[in-house]
Amino acid sequence: MLLLEEKIHKKVVIVGIPGVGKTSLVTAIVEKISDTGIVVSVQSYGTLMFEEAKNFGVKDRDELRKLPVEKQKELQKNTAENISSLTYDIVFIDTNAFISTTEGFYPGLPNQVIQIIQPTHFIAISARPEEIYNRRMKDETRNRDKISIESIKKELAIQDSMLSTCSVLSGSPMKVILNNEGKIEEAANNVIKAIGV
């Protein structure tokens, strides 16, 4: 437990493939932490990149991953600089560990981004592949590519390898948190414990 005199300043990268329930979980985490008087901000990396990309004529967020990698790098760098200047007690950086591009899997957090943001923690939200599959199939609000249990397992493996690399490069801890069906409260408490709040 932190003493009130201590100044908290954490930058927590939180990732999860579609269907792990990341958005709902982040909402629950923020509510719990905010109730303690700690000032929390959630920054959606993709949304911030999209806002800047509009200046280049990008009209849809899904177009971001279709941009040339060099343009994505530029947008990532600018977004990282904006996030690094934030002074909230805790900043959650909601992002993807990887982006599936026409050139292959591109890291959501390349080294230059890590060096700019200097995250204090990396959290990977996960769930059983079958649960992820079922959640994706029920989600009619998204236009997702065809999926299988095997492709979900591959995505989870890529996410873990990308995020563990980020942990090595930054020297900050990484924790995988399971967000199993009906256990969001438990998952939220596990994230809060992992970041030392």
Regions found by a protein language model. Give the residues of each.
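ATP-dependent NMP and nucleoside kinases share a basic, alpha-helical "lid"
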Residues: 95-140
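NTP-dependent small-molecule kinase module
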Residues: 2-5, 161-197
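Hydrophobic positions on the alpha1 helix immediately C-terminal to the Walker A/P-loop
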Residues: 25
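Conserved lysine of the Walker
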Residues: 22
